[in-house]
Amino acid sequence: HEAFASQVLATIQNLEDATHLKKAGTDFSFGKFPMEKLNPNGSSIAIGHPFGATGARILSQTVKSLHLLGKGKKAVISVCAD
């Protein structure tokens, strides 16, 4: 939901920040995040997210999207749920 958008934006910001990555112990550069590819299917409500199945639902939707788009082999998933 929109309440979790801050988790995603913070993750992207940290992956693009060389200083943060150095503090985290890596010199790997993720480069600029392609924002136009962010959340192409809408929010968890839009894709019929079942309560209590966050990880499984997000993972299965990501695999399905990679298959349907046919353009990529990798995806980044960010979840902030216990």
Predicted regions and their residues:
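Claisen-condensing/thiolase-fold acyl-transfer catalytic domains that form or cleave C-C bonds
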Residues: 1-82
